[in-house]
Amino acid sequence: MLKKKAKTKSSSKKWSSFKNARSMHVLLYLLLAAIMFALLFVHVKPETLDLDLFSVSDKTIYAPATVEDQKATEEKKQAAEDAVEDQYTLKKEYTDNRIDLVSSIFDSISEVKKSSEEGSKSPSEKSMVKSVKDKLTSDVNDSISEDSIKTLLKADSEDFSFVRDTVITAVNTVMSSEIPSDKLSDAKDKVEKELKSNSIPSKYLGAATEIGRFAIIPNYVFDPKATEAKRQEASDNVQQVQIKQGQVLVEENDLIDREVYRKLELTGLLNNSNLFKPISGLLIMIGLFIATLVYYFEKQKQNLKFKNQSILLFSIITTLLLVIMEVVSLFQKMEYNNIGYLVPIAAGAILIKLLMNERIAILGSIILAICGSMMFNQGVTGTFNYVIGIYYLISGISGVLFLGKHNARSKILQTGLFVAFINMVVVLSLLLIQNTALSGLEIGTLMLMGVVSGFASSVLIIGLMPFFETGFGILSTMRLLELSNPNHPLLRKILTETPGTYHHSVMVANLSEAACEAVGANGLLARVGAYYHDLGKTKRPQYFIENQMNIDNPHDKLSPQLSKNIIISHTTDGANMLRSYKFPKELVDIAEQHHGTSLLKFFYYKAKEKGDQITEEEFRYPGPKPQSKEAAIISVADSVEAAVRSMHNPNPERIEKLVRGIISDKLQDGQFSECDLTFKELDTIAKTLCATLKGIFHSRIEYPEATKKVK
């Protein structure tokens, strides 16, 4: 039996040390990430189908994502290229070349004429023609007849020059226009027409026409580079052919032909090879969630144990809501996929706010909204149902903001009512924005779902709060109200065993609550902390003056050192008793810290008078000093109440002087050095305590003592 007990104690010790270990929160982050991945992957994993070519589809199949249809895109690009006509370019240099050619023909004839005129012996016509032809290229000789050469050789200088200029002008005019190869004949006819219209003597017209027609060639020629550039431009302007997300690939009872089968393959519906992207994306998103949480929690000034507890608490609430969403999502169908509106999503954010704080609650709302938009994505195009995501986000954040700084049970119910109203309005607005074709009955049903979600959130919160408070030792308003019940065993113990201490504690509670509320601290925590701050006095009630009724003071018979030990021990005794009753740490701290390290002056000076060799440190409380505003304010209220109670004929001036003196002494003694009270707040505390004490110790009418008896 002893062995088993030792083993249990050892394992408990190991768990406690692990709970305080830095590796604990790393493990919690990894565990939360793994749970998120397990619950979300099934909703982002692409659907795969077992279908055969030329089979009949048993359902309408939609494209799960937008993908490019490369085959169709290439076909469209090729069609665009084929539609581009050949590109031609007007070669202006061809005009100059042909004019030069015409000039060279006339120059050759002119040279032969000049040579024959200068010679002593006139050459024969035949030899002159031969001389001209020798000067011309073969293609010119093939195109220009000897008769034309002879005619021009016989022309006088004036006619020769006129014919030359007229042919050059006509060629230039015709060649200045585009002459494609298929229009060459028309261009030659045009130059002939030009020549005929220029009054060339009839005997030269044939020769001029022959040279003019020969000079005309196609100048509007095919340009391969321009054609290729145009085709490339046409190809580049073709938009990608895409299979859009949500596009119908095949209708129910339709044949799956080769084209449909190709599209099913293209969208990844026939194989599992396209898992890399969704897995990677989901891991990145979860990584961002965890990184944000790490950043938030690492900034919190908490010891390792409470940081681990906060992470665990957040993880449990988040997992709980994810599981609820997963269960509800099992009932969604293609024809009715709006069941997600029923999820009490606000419960998660409000629970986090009640048990932790508002900032992390809003972060939790964002994470749950994104996760919910993935879980309820059936029947929508894409992985995310943005409508449900917006609904979840507004629902969660509105609940957190409406709750504010209050968390009484009645306020939670009011918050549920408010969230129900907000949900109803959000559902209606989203449906109107979508311009949905739903009937009035269907819209009403969805709005009713939002109302149910709001009420369910408040019920879930009230039901779960006690479990979280007990399991994590969290101090909430409901827990404080429960501990402030006069029927609590420890309060009954204080009342019955130390009635003077009980009355003192109630007075301190009233004072400290008012002071805390004046500086923005937790007034209810201060009230309940004050009720239990002197619990340790129940161990030796008669040694404390407020409980010494009709008995001698036992300290008169004790040494100052022994009296000091008895008085000082009440802080640690009280803290230990509260721990044994599993009280929240905040209340234990108040019991332990309400005297800080202050000096027990009465017994210190008594010992000094006796001549004992002592130091101040021996007569100081062990501390620690107050760590919170509430503990510091209770320490002031405790001293003030005791001092004012012992004051003879208290009046406002004397009370204020006493209060400010006590605060000043504690400040100079360094009792506030470890809490975050400011000088301004200390002044506010002094004013509030004075005002409260003046109300308690106000002047009363002095009734004369009845000294005469009625005869």
From Swiss-Prot:
Binding-site list for Mn(2+) 2: D534, H570, H594, H595
The enzyme's E.C. designation: 3.1.4.59
One cellular-component annotation, GO: plasma membrane
Region feature Disordered, mapped onto this chain: 114-133
Cellular compartment(s): Cell membrane
Enzyme class name: hydrolase
Hydrolase as UniProt keyword: yes
Binding residue positions for substrate: H504, Y621, D638
Topology of the protein relative to the lipid bilayer: Multi-pass membrane protein
Catalytic activity of the protein: 3',3'-c-di-AMP + H2O = 5'-O-phosphonoadenylyl-(3'->5')-adenosine + H(+)
Annotated positions binding Mn(2+) 1: H504, H533, D534, D638
InterPro entries: HD/PDEase_dom (IPR003607), HD_domain (IPR006674), HDIG_dom (IPR006675), Metal-dep_PHydrolase_7TM_extra (IPR011624), Metal-dep_PHydrolase_7TM_intra (IPR011621), PgpH_phosphodiesterase (IPR052722)
Pfam families reported in the protein's UniProt record: 7TM-7TMR_HD, 7TMR-HDED, HD
Cofactor(s) the protein requires to work: Mn(2+)
Primary location class: membrane
GO molecular function: cyclic-di-AMP phosphodiesterase activity; hydrolase activity; metal ion binding
Keywords for the protein's UniProt record, in alphabetical order: Cell membrane, Hydrolase, Manganese, Membrane, Metal-binding, Transmembrane, Transmembrane helix
Similarity field: Belongs to the PgpH phosphodiesterase family.
NCBIfam families (alphabetical): HDIG
The protein's name in its UniProt record: Cyclic-di-AMP phosphodiesterase PgpH
Taxonomic source organism: Bacillus subtilis (strain 168)
